[in-house]
Amino acid sequence: MSQEDKQRITVEIYNRKYHIVGEESERHMQLVADLVDQKMNEIHEVNKQLDTSSLAVLTAVNTMNDYLKLKEDYATLLGSIKKKED
């Protein structure tokens, strides 16, 4: 996909505007931004003393942890399906 074909949107995450360019639909990119914003606000409610940079890193760590758990669950499910097919 060429640079001209990519979607460009402006989103708000944790009260800051960001310009995002990507290959996904605008709807998808907005959903991602909304989820990041939601996660940052959730973490902020528990850790009000965190500065924005620390909050962003903690959000990334939590998100990757969730991603890895889902990836492991997916692999387990695929393994179960494969065993049933054999």
Curated annotation (Swiss-Prot):
Keyword Cytoplasm: yes or no? yes
Q: Does the keyword Cytoplasm apply?
A: yes
Keywords in UniProt for this one? Answer: Cell cycle, Cell division, Cytoplasm, Septation
Cell location: Cytoplasm
What GO CC annotations are associated with the protein?
A: cell division site; cell septum; cytosol; plasma membrane
Q: Report the domain of life of the source organism.
A: Bacteria
GO process annotations (BP)? division septum assembly; FtsZ-dependent cytokinesis; septin ring assembly
SUPFAM superfamilies in the record: Cell division protein ZapA-like
Function of the molecule: Activator of cell division through the inhibition of FtsZ GTPase activity, therefore promoting FtsZ assembly into bundles of protofilaments necessary for the formation of the division Z ring. It is recruited early at mid-cell but it is not essential for cell division.
Subunit structure, briefly? Homodimer. Interacts with FtsZ.
The cross-references to PANTHER family, in alphabetical order and at most eight, read:
CELL DIVISION PROTEIN ZAPA (PTHR34981:SF1)
Q: Which family does it belong to?
A: Belongs to the ZapA family. Type 2 subfamily.
The protein in question is named Cell division protein ZapA
Organism of provenance: Oceanobacillus iheyensis (strain DSM 14371 / CIP 107618 / JCM 11309 / KCTC 3954 / HTE831)
